[in-house]
Amino acid sequence: VGLIVQKFGGTSVADLERIRNVARRVARTRDAGEDIVVVVSAMAGETDRLLEMSRTICKEPSRRETDVLVSTGEQVTSALLALCLQGMGYPAVSLLGHQVRIYTDSNFTTARVQSVDGARLRKELSLGKIVVVAGFQGIDEHGDITTLGRGGSDLTAVAVAAVLGAKLCEIYTDVKGVYTTDPNICPEARKINKISYDEMLEMASLGAKVLQTRSVQFAKKFDVPIHVRSSFSEEEGTMVVVEDRDMERFVVSGITYRMDEGKITIKKVPDTPGIAASIFGPLAEADIVVDMIVQNVSEEGFTDLTFTVPKGAMEQALRIVERTAENLGAKGTTFDEDIAKVSIIGVGMRTQSGVAAKMFAALASEGINIQMISTSQIKISCVIQAKYLELAIRVLHHAFGLGEDTVQQAPPWA
């Protein structure tokens, strides 16, 4: 008998009928002879509803109490699903984060998982029960409830799968898998059958919302195979697994985008050692994540420095940067929130030349100007004007032949 972990997101458990639907699916897996641990999110919209209540009653709610409050969303769905399974004649038990003993740090609302004690899970499984775990939550060393941040139920599922040595972690969502790009923007987008952890990590961190980034990191570290699939269909989804030779045949496997960043430019900064540290140091201290950085070629001892930050941190970043720029004797700062970042991703890029040139030529053919570029071994990102984003995605999807069943492949000898 194998063990499978199944995780169901908010849309999959949005109401009682959908919870019944999930119970039927879990029961089918059980009937096939598998041991099962199910991880559930709160009902769609429930976490936001609870957060709104906390902000209504208190202008700046403490993060500790916020976690106590929002963790109840998953408590409700885990109990309802266990009750539903029991009503169908299946022995089931619901467990909360602290009962499973998912230990985290004390960083309330965005806690990191430190360890999972599998003893209680193994005990319940040995008694023949289907175990339903409340996702998104854990407990710190003081016994306080913590939550794992947006998408945290994915992390719960992968962490539980890792500690129990599950043969598979199935992530059920409202889409049929991981697509070559957003099907709402590009109708030709195709479902990817198999993708490597590294590609999935880039896609998740660059805007693909199917899996939470930390859950993919965790899966890679502990070699947990993930199957992303739809809870509303029987179709096979996308397997996220260790990279194999087969994957390198595809030069580009996906295109992602983000619209949640803005860019800041500091004009005419004195080009001397230590300048970058004095600009980015204060931003790091304020916990502001800087993404892309471009420095112009120095002219007469001065240079322009441009970088992107999350739009939500723009005001704070500008305040810090303007102060720093003044101290450095720079000519001033400008900002632009009307930008988008589009990225192409694929492990085949490691062995294939000309990918960047092809990307830039495709964008140029539609008159799309590239403002910033950043690359890694398996991705190229460009910042462009926001209004061109959808056009850029479609033209790149076409240029790299991602809509065809015979996706452009690197030559077999590459």
List the predicted regions and their residue ranges.
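Nucleotide/pyrophosphate-binding catalytic subdomain
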Residues: 1-216, 384-385, 400, 404, ...
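Conserved dinucleotide-binding and phosphotransfer motif residues
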Residues: 32, 88, 222, 286, ...
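Active-site beta-loop-alpha junctions enriched in small/polar residues
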Residues: 43, 231, 295
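A conserved regulatory-domain signal marking ACT and ACT-like small-molecule sensing domains
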Residues: 57, 237-414
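Short hydrophobic alpha-helical runs that function as membrane-insertion/retention elements
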Residues: 168-172, 226-228, 291, 372
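Acidic-aromatic/histidine active-site loop/patch
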Residues: 219
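Active-site C-terminal subdomain of aminotransferase-like
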Residues: 224-235, 259
